[in-house]
Amino acid sequence: MESADFYEVEPRPPMSSHLQSPPHAPSNAAFGFPRGAGPAPPPAPPAAPEPLGGICEHETSIDISAYIDPAAFNDEFLADLFQHSRQQEKAKAAAGPAGGGGDFDYPGAPAGPGGAVMSAGAHGPPPGYGCAAAGYLDGRLEPLYERVGAPALRPLVIKQEPREEDEAKQLALAGLFPYQPPPPPPPPHPHASPAHLAAPHLQFQIAHCGQTTMHLQPGHPTPPPTPVPSPHAAPALGAAGLPGPGSALKGLAGAHPDLRTGGGGGGSGAGAGKAKKSVDKNSNEYRVRRERNNIAVRKSRDKAKQRNVETQQKVLELTSDNDRLRKRVEQLSRELDTLRGIFRQLPESSLVKAMGNCA
């Protein structure tokens, strides 16, 4: 199905005939419009023939392969590119206050503070502006290829990616030493001596030295150590400022007087004491508990006996079925042997007749 907006067009006249400006008026069908769609425009005045080479005499080609495939070049090319652009920016900043028009001045423009501000209508566009722009771009791009490998460049710093072994070590250390928020600093103890507080501080540094050395860069200074809580508050508070097991046992013993805690406080390293129950056997609670336990034991035993009886009954049923099937197999085997003996005693002629009668 053809579209109603497109029509057949006439072939475009060659360039030579266009420059010679034929006297006939151009047809509207050449522009994709239907014939007779509008009034024919007046014929254009003949233009003087102009050579095609006069558009831009100093036309040069620019190699942009470096921007299309930068992987084919080394890192020095990119470093030189960035350094050259920074030098150009510095030169622009230095030449700006001096009164120059910057990179936007064209040749022949009046120099001065108002040179770049003056309108183009007063002076007219400069001749050969396209050629000047092409030469400007060539001058900007040529030093990029000339300065590659210059000895005056500073050494290029290449960022190294972390290896898999280092990442595995960091993950292992992060699992062994998980980050925990530091506890708030405790109030200074009036009777604590500096020598008494030195040992926990040293142990804290030793415990966290592996994690600190892995996460810090070589050039960064070591941060100050985290203040260590006082050893007097260790039984009450754990490593993360939470109540230790000793305080929980004490609170449980205070709530239930029938529970007694064994010796040993929480966080001492020797292990918390085992809690032992002392229940009075003459109390009603003990009797109710024993009765419930006995009932549960009886129920479980009754269920076990019932399952045993059901299993025995099923075994008996299966055994009887097996005997019945065995007897049936023996009977069928005897009948088969009898039939085989009968067919063996019959002559072949009778067998042929029997087969003919069946057919």
Curated annotation (Swiss-Prot):
Asked if the keyword Phosphoprotein belongs to this entry, the reply reads yes
Query: Where is this protein chiefly located?
Result: nucleus
Give the phenotype of cells or organisms lacking this gene: Mutants die of hypoglycemia at 7-10 hours after birth. They have defects in the control of hepatic growth and lung development. The liver architecture is disturbed with acinar formation. They show hyperproliferation of type II pneumocytes and disturbed alveolar architecture. At the molecular level, accumulation of glycogen and lipids in the liver and adipose tissues is impaired, and the mutant animals are severely hypoglycemic. In very few cases (less than 1%) mutants are able to survive up to 4 weeks but they are sevrely retarded in development.
Region (Basic motif) residue ranges read: 287-314
Q: Region Leucine-zipper: which residues?
A: 318-346
Example of a GO MF term: transcription factor binding
- Where is the sequence biased in composition, kind Gly residues? 261-272
Location of this chain's protein in the cell: Nucleus
Tell me the segments the record calls region Required to functionally cooperate with SREBF1 in promoter activation. 180-194
Region entry Required to induce adipocyte differentiation: which residue ranges?
Answer: 126-200
Q: How does it assemble?
A: Binds DNA as a homodimer and as a heterodimer. Can form stable heterodimers with CEBPB, CEBPD, CEBPE and CEBPG. Interacts with PRDM16. Interacts with UBN1. Interacts with ZNF638; this interaction increases transcriptional activation. Interacts with the complex TFDP2:E2F1; the interaction prevents CEBPA binding to target gene promoters and represses its transcriptional activity. Interacts with RB1. Interacts (when phosphorylated at Ser-193) with CDK2, CDK4, E2F4 and SMARCA2. Interacts with SREBPF1.
Q: What does this protein do?
A: Transcription factor that coordinates proliferation arrest and the differentiation of myeloid progenitors, adipocytes, hepatocytes, and cells of the lung and the placenta. Binds directly to the consensus DNA sequence 5'-T[TG]NNGNAA[TG]-3' acting as an activator on distinct target genes. During early embryogenesis, plays essential and redundant functions with CEBPB. Essential for the transition from common myeloid progenitors (CMP) to granulocyte/monocyte progenitors (GMP). Critical for the proper development of the liver and the lung.
Name of the protein in question: CCAAT/enhancer-binding protein alpha
Name of the encoding gene: Cebpa
